[in-house]
Design a protein with these regions (language model features):
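Flexible glycine/proline-enriched surface loops and loop-helix/loop-strand junctions
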Residues: 166-174
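Acyl-CoA thioester-binding alpha/beta core of soluble enzymes
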Residues: 1-68, 96, 100-108, 124-132, ...
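PLP-dependent aminotransferase-like
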Residues: 53-91
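Short amphipathic alpha-helical "interface-anchor" segments enriched in bulky aromatics
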Residues: 147-155
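Hydrophobic alpha-helical scaffolding
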Residues: 89, 108, 141, 145-148, ...
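Glycine/threonine-rich flexible loop motifs
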Residues: 96-97, 113-124, 140-142
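Short glycine-biased active-site loop of nucleotidyltransferases that positions the nucleotide triphosphate
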Residues: 31, 77-78, 142-144
Length: 272
């Protein structure tokens, strides 16, 4: 932990807030008449956890992956609950047109690639709420680097804290991914509320390294069983965690189990 605190990237992370939310322009408030439309360009855990949470709350979440690069089966079963998934090649003109039409009618865009990786696709739209997830943030000497939970755990000193004198260790779960995913969903909801009231194109940014910095503080212990449930669907019977989002009158679980990866049409639910 001390080495990370002294590292230039560690100092950049420590000097910044846990997450950032920005208003980019004076676009008018959007008048939504149907379910919230969320376009999901994320992979593995953190981003998919965020969009899974939005799906729980009633959003129409459509995940887009490149053809031939499906999500890992276990990750798909865990994090694509409540969503539909489709494949589009954004380098193909016909697929790009389909994607642009989806983006034009989306309320939220969530991306989970390294900073700058998707810039060539011109993903900005007036009034859109965009949430960008990265490993290290888009600042500091590591700002443009790729990364994932386990690497960030080691870099930030969690590997030392959880390890032994002989070798580094790790948290018993990808806690940075899951924590960042839920924080991202909460930040999107706040930005949507502000967009509804005040207008403006909105940008949310989070990084696994920021969550790691936050989670290194002591957290209370708990018993996991009361947070688990089971569901039946096309992938069989799944045992999984309940959503951490709960409120009186709200949903207790997702509206649909994960289906077969990529089996849905690239269209919003009302048009499929």
């Amino acid at each position: 932990p001390a080495e990370w605190a002294a590292h230039p990237q560690g100092r950049e992370v420590a000097a910044r807030p846990l997450l950032s939310r920005e208003r980019l322009d004076e676009a008018p408030p959007r008048r939504r008449t149907g379910p919230l439309r969320v376009l999901d360009l994320t992979r593995v855990i953190a981003g998919p956890v965020a969009t899974r949470t939005l799906a729980l709350l009633g959003a129409d979440v459509l995940r887009i992956d490149p053809p031939g690069s499906p999500e890992l089966p276990d990750q798909h079963a865990d994090t694509d609950v409540g969503k539909r998934t489709a494949a589009l090649d954004l380098e193909r003109p016909s697929d790009r047109r389909t994607f642009d039409e989806l983006l034009d009618s989306a309320d939220v865009l969530v991306t989970g690639y390294r900073p700058g990786a998707l810039d060539r696709f011109r993903l900005d739209r007036p009034g859109l709420v965009t949430a960008r997830l990265s490993a290290w943030g888009d600042y500091g000497p590591w700002g443009g680097r790729r990364g994932f939970d386990s690497l960030v755990q080691v870099a930030t000193g969690i590997g030392v804290t959880e390890g032994s004198p002989r070798e580094p260790g790790a948290l018993p779960a990808q806690a940075l991914d899951h924590g960042t995913g839920y924080l991202l969903a909460a930040a999107v909801l706040r930005s949507l509320t502000e967009q509804d009231r005040e207008g403006g194109t909105r940008l949310v940014r989070l990084a696994l390294a920021q969550t790691g910095h936050w989670l290194t503080h002591a957290l209370p212990r708990y018993e996991p069983e009361r947070y688990l449930t089971e569901s039946q669907g096309p992938l069989g019977r799944l045992r999984h965690a309940l959503s951490p989002v709960s409120y009186e009158g709200g949903p207790s679980s997702w509206s649909r189990p994960p289906g077969l990866a990529g089996a849905d049409a690239p269209a919003w639910a009302s048009q499929a």
